[in-house]
Amino acid sequence: MSIFDERHHSGSGVVAITIDEHDGTRPDIDVVPSFDYVRYDSSDQTRQHRGSKVFPKTGSPIVNYPQQQLDRGTAKNGRTNGRYKRFARALKSAENQLVADGTISDLPSYFMECLIWNVQDEILTGGSDLSAGFKSVLVWLWNGLKEENYVRTDWEEPNGLKYLFHPGAKWTPGDARELVLATWQYLDY
């Protein structure tokens, strides 16, 4: 089975609730209960970004901007002929296998999407096939995440409103480096 078509069941987590598939119903789905949230970027409250706020079982509330993420992700996926989403899923599939093998610790699915979001479109569309393209993506990520090259403000979430690596984030640049290296080795590149 290839990392480009694997699907994994993860179960309910800290934020999402999994609704299991039953005979005659759709496949398992994850549901996230949330509340409306508005971020104001001006003192007169004229510049705003609408999002959602979720309250996990443990820890601090989480603010997301799903519409901005959807709009920007859809645009990037179109610009890259579907490779943005495909490579995000491939990285998550590799991460799932690496976790199952005990090679790395489990990371949130959104983190894989965030990493691929930061890869330039021309890198995502390069390569003669998906494997060569994914290899180029891993090289780009590795080079950008090296301690001597890493600049925190160069990395953002797909919504464009939050830095990827910030105090309180569920992941670090070290987690990303470990994931990229382990994926490279797993795929025997």
Briefly describe each language-model feature range.
Residues S2-E147, W184-D188:
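Catalytic cores of NTP-dependent nucleotidyl/adenyl transfer enzymes across multiple folds
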Residues E148-Y189:
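Terminal (often C-terminal) interaction modules
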